Each structure stands twice: as C-alpha cells, then as structure tokens.
Amino acid sequence: MVATSGSSIWMRRLRRALARRPHHLMRAGRALGVVGGVMAAGGAYAIDLPEDRADAMYHFYDGGGTRADGPALLIRKKVADRLSISGSYFIDSVSNASIDVVTTASPYKEKRTEYSLGADYVYRDAQVSLSGTTSDEPDYKANSVSLDVSQEVFGGMTTISLGASRGADHVGSRYEGMFDRAQHWRYRFGVTQILTPRWLMSANLEAISDNGYLGNPYRVAQVFGTLVQERYPRTRSSRALKLRAVGDIGQGEQRAALRAEYRYFWDNWEIKAHTLEVGYTRYFGAEWLGEAFVRYNTQKQALFYSDNAQSETLYVSRNKQLSDFNDVGIGAKATYSAGKIADKFDVKWNAQYQFMRFRYKNFTDIRTHGLYSFDANILELFVSATF
C-alpha cells in the first residue's frame, strides 16, 4: 500500500493513461486538425479499431519521502476486421519513507505488479470494449473487470458512451496477512459532441460505490494527542463530473491545439474536490510535437478527518488524503516522430515531466508541529511503434 496522496493518486492516473493511450479521443479527432495532442484530418463516419501498436514506458515519481519507478508495456493487435486485443504489464517498485511512515513506523520497500487483457469489437458506428486487470503486492491483491460501449450518432457528430467496472480486493498487512475484503462498482456515462470543424466538447459522469475495508492498516490517528488505529466507514458513495473542451487554433504549418478540463468530485464522506487543467499543444516542424500544461486541484476534508481529535467518535482518521489541501502541477511533453523503421514500424519517442506542489491546510508534521507540504517530480519516458 502506497501511503502518500501524491504518489498513489499519480500512479492511478498513470495506469489509466497507459491503458487508453493513444486511442483516447481519436474518433472525435478525425474531425479536427488537433485534438488533445493528436493531429488528424478527415471526416467522421464510422468507428475504427485502435491501431496495431506496441508501447514501452519507464515511469519515475519522487516526492514526500516516496520514490516509485518501474516499466510498463502495452501491446495491441487486430485479430480480425472488427476485433482487436490488447495486453499490458505494469510494475511499481516503491521505497516509502513518507510522513505517515516515518512518524509512526519504519520505512519500507515493496513491489506491485499489474497485468491486464482487453478486447475491442466494432460494428458500424458502435464499439464494445471488455477488459480485465489483476494487481498484486505483498499486502494488497486486486482484480477488476470493465465493460464499455460507445455509439456514434447524428452522422458521427456525437458519441455516447456507457461503462461499468467491478472490482474485488483482498486487503492485508505485513503483520497479519490478508484479513479483509473490499468491493468497488463504477458506472460511467459520457457524451462527446463535435461543435465545429475545429472544436469539440465532452461531458462525463461517473458514479462509484465502495464497500468493505476502505482504510489503511498502517495508518494511525490522534485523539487527545494519543495515537490510535484509524476507523473508517465500510461504505462510500462518490460522484465525479468532468467537462472537457478541445480546439484547433492553428493554421497551416502552425498547427496547435488548446484544451481545458474541469472536474468536480463529491462523496457521502463530505469530501468535495475541484480540479482545473489547461494545456497547449503545438507542432514544431514535421517531426516535433510539444505540449505544456498546468493543473490545479483543491479539496475539502472528510467529515471524520481530524489532525488531533478532541472527542471520541465512531470514525476517525488522520489520513492527509482526506484533509483540506491543494496541489498545483506544471508540466511539459515532447514527442519526436522518427518515421518508418524497416518500412513497417512508425516509431515515436516521448518524454514528459511534471512538477507538483502539495500544501496541506490542516495536517501537521508532528515532528515540527507546522503545516505539512511537499514537492514531487514525475518523469515518463516511452516509445511507441505502430505497425
């Protein structure tokens, strides 16, 4: 279990990004000059299968006393005119000396591996995607299955998508072995609309239901200055709404794109979070594609969070992920198109760096008694080959 808000949140985002790269929003991109950093032209009439491709990536995270790195692989191949299969492999090697660990326990190292298999089937203007994922680490085992369906309507100008995921986890600790379970349901609905030949917009709503053991066996809370084991509710219901706009703002060889995203998250633990991200993408010549982006996130604390509780309650947590905090991220990405290799493989080299700064408003470092904050550095290097 990774115990820092920055690293755990980032690694979940990274795994999701790898799973959907590079077909993300490609269908809508056929009607734009630039969409989210992928530039294409043409008309939108029917859904195409994702390209045959292979991706290899190295990821690195360093922040808040936690260091995580490892490789990731993704392979996708068409096996029929309408069917494509994919598989991915992901490793996190974590060295954890975060504030949660060094103040209540000893630093530790662990490795997490994840495997996934998926299939995409297209028929006319519809696509069905089925995938399964299994993740294993010394004290946590997770399995999930997802089903997503998308349908283009109104001549390809609108795409409607529906999806559902089911997860089943085994929760443990280094001291007790596996001692409990957790279950997760996720339901998704989205609409992507081409507004003009240069602009599109999407809206996505997700509902999440969790039950079982939802805490962390290594984390403790403070009650009257005394350390006690955290106590979490065994159920949680969450909602997330995301709005995204992407547009082509370039002309001729000065092709460029601008994107803006807003996400609102709320749950029955009374957490509320707002996230805003803006990005700019531009070609530099025929071979180089650059992107710069900035992201801001702010969160309000959970009902049962307390830095140092002054009364006994049924639930209590000092998990900084549930506190009041904000984070700012700024990053850049560069893509180099190397062209054809062996007259078959179209190769692209990619590098992305992001700097993040976390500031906590009501979580203190018990070593210094000051409000806690930390900075994080994130690096991704990957190569993609279509064939």
Identify what each model region corresponds to.
Residues 1-50, 387:
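Cleavable N-terminal export/targeting peptides
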Residues 44-86, 356, 377-378:
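Short glycine/proline- and aromatic-enriched beta-strand/turn motifs that initiate or cap beta-hairpins
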Residues 45-51, 82, 154-158, 198, ...:
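Short loop/turn motifs that connect adjacent beta-strands in outer-membrane beta-barrel proteins
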Residues 58-62, 91-95, 123-125, 134-138, ...:
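Transmembrane beta-strands of outer-membrane beta-barrel pores
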